[in-house]
Amino acid sequence: KKMIGWDEILQPELPKDIVIHSWRGTAALAEAARKGYYGILSNGYYIDLIQPASHHYASDPLPADSTLTPEQAKHVLGGEATMWAEWVTPETIDSRIWPRTAAIAERLWSPRTVTDVNDMYRRLGIISLQLEELGLMHKRNQDMMLRRLARHEDIGPLQTLVSVVEPVKEYRRYQMRPQTMLSPLTGVIDAATPDAEGARRFTWMVKEFLADAPRYQLYRAELTQMLSEWQESGAALGPMIDRSPALKEIKPLTKGLSELGEVGLEAISYLKLGQPPAREWREATTLKLDEAAKPYAALEFMVVPAVKQLVQAAVEIGQPRRATSSM
C-alpha cells in the first residue's frame, strides 16, 4: 500500500515514498516531481464543476510547456477524476459522471499530441450510447425528469431548451442558489448536462457556414431549421410554464430562446441577400443578445457566441475582408 495525500502534506521532512495528490494544478505537481515525489493530478478533472468534456480533454498532467526532465516526468503517475457530491442525487449522478469521464480516461492514456476535440466528441457520442446499453441512466433520466417538470405534457420544447443550455460552471451555482439540506435537486438545471449537444452542433455548423462566404450555403438549411425550432419551442414553453409551477424559474430563458432564434434567422437572411442590416437592427439585436447572455435559474445559453458571430458577419456585409498574414 502507498500513502497518498493532498498538496498540503508536501513538507521538507516528508518521506519520498508518499504520493502527492495535487488539486492545485500542474505547477504544484511539477514541484513535487522535482523534489523526487510521485504525484497524481486532479486539478482539471473535477467533474462537479460542470465543465464540458473539451475542458477536461485539454488538461494534461504533463502540459506542453512542462520543464520537467524526462527522469522527473516519470514521477507524474497520471490523473484522477474527482467529484464533490453536494449537487447530485441518485437520479442525476450518472449524468454528472458519464460520459465525460470517458474523455478524461482517453486524455490520461493518450499521447499529449492527441488533441482533436471534434473527433473526441464524435467517439464520445458512441461511447455514451454503449454506456446506456450497460444500464447507466445518464440519458434516460433526463427525459424522465423533464416529463415530471412538465407534468407529463409533451417535453419536445423542453428538450430543445435543454439542448442549448448548460448549468453555470465552477462554484457559481452556490453563489446564485444558497443550498440547504432541503434544497430540491429536481429542476431544469439538474436535468441539463455539462455538454449541451445541440449548442455544440449549432456552433460547429455556424463556423462552417461562415467559412462558406460569400455563398453562405453550407449548413444554411440545417441552421434555419434549428433556429426556427428555437422560436417555436420558446413560444410553446410559455403555456406549459403557466401550468407547471416548477418551471416558472426558467421563464426568462423561454424568451431568450425565441429571441435567439429570431436574431439568428434574421442574420442569415441578411447574409443570404447580401444586404447589411440597418443600424436600428444592430442596436436592438445587441440588447437582445446581451440579455440572452445572462444566466437564469443557474442556467446559461451556450449558443450566444455563435449567434453573435452570425450577427457580426451580417453587419460586415460589403466591408473589405480582413487580410490574413502568412507570417
Predicted regions and their residues:
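Substrate-binding groove of N-acetylhexosamine-processing glycoside hydrolases
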Residues: 1-327
